[in-house]
From Swiss-Prot:
Zn(2+) 2 binds at D104, E139, H352. The gene is dapE. Binds 2 Zn(2+) or Co(2+) ions per subunit. This is Succinyl-diaminopimelate desuccinylase. InterPro entries: Bact_exopeptidase_dim_dom, DapE_proteobac, Peptidase_M20, Peptidase_M20_dimer, Peptidase_M20A. The active site is at D73, E138. Zn(2+) 1 binds at H71, D104, E167. It catalyses: N-succinyl-(2S,6S)-2,6-diaminopimelate + H2O = (2S,6S)-2,6-diaminopimelate + succinate. Its EC number is 3.5.1.18.
Amino acid sequence: MKIDPVELTKKLISFKSITPRDDGAIEHIAAILEKSGFDCEILEFGDNKTKVKNLYAKYINGVQNLCFAGHVDVVPPGQLKDWISDPFSPEVRDGLLYGRGATDMKSGIAAFITAMVDLVAEKFRFNGSISALITSAEESTEEYGTKAVLKWMESKHKKIDYCVVAEPTSSEKLGDTIKIGRRGSATFELICHGKQGHVAYPDLADNPIYKMISILNRIKDTTFDGGNKYFQPSNCEITTIDVGNSTDNVILDSITAGFNIRYNNMQTPDGLYKLIDEICFSVTNDYKLSMHSSRGAFLSTPDRNTDVMFDAINKVTNIDAVLATSGGTSDAAFIKDVCPVIEFGMINKTSHQVNECVLVNDIHKLTAIYKEFIKSYFYPTNRILNQINVIGNVPDSPLLA
């Protein structure tokens, strides 16, 4: 059986899989893979409020297991009137396929599913096994998505040796960027307390706003680190300040602020919390600090398989990719705990935007790249076996592409 990656992308877009729903996409992919001889496990995790469907599918032909990972869930489309067409009714215009998830990341999933199915149909002799890990909870309820699947795999003694996550990593042209790591994300909420009073009698009140201003200024002036060869310096951005005051003559008794630290592999969430807590305590002891951090910073040191991806990209696109660790978080942060992982996929310019779109021709190119990668992963050429240039050519400056 052979499939058309563009038609599969269209079909996946047609599923209204607003996170954490899959709307039938998981079952559709499983049906395709089962017809090609894959063993498929549809896994549902969740609680009374949320149920998340995931898929782990494996074509068994040996111990070594190459896995492709991705997510079918998408963010909400926003105002429908702003779209040139229905975001869940895929439409091709001037060589571009429009629809929610076209870039992030239904085209990537369609490409690696097609690559695997095509190779099976071509009777390619995998020197090992190939698998797919697909979730419908990357954009939101991550606890029941990839993270839960990996825990299930561990309990069943199922192993992954290497993983490619099909996130849209390219910047300007398909093939220009491979992600070998990501910064972690730590989100803080700080509440400073004071005493309510009349603005005409500040001596009888305790204005918490000044405490918050002092703390946020100290956080802003803090140098967390200087970055390193792979990562830019850790950075904090204030995202909200709220006192909920509807009048102009009252000093309220509390103020809340939110801020996010994107941190590199020199930091840990616990270390950041301790540092922020010390800054708060240096100003006041009447505060409450909380932190949420799920996906940590990670780095997959470039290796032979990075070279395999470089060569596959160059063979199809004639582009020399660069390595990067920039951008937001992804499920690769969970996968890195079980095996080496890289991310490579479509151009990221329209992800999460109105009129999200992808070049139709790029879907075919990405499929070809994944096929080349799979073949060379299992049967590396002598040039790849003797190649160590990727590790030696990592630039001295952080990977900010």
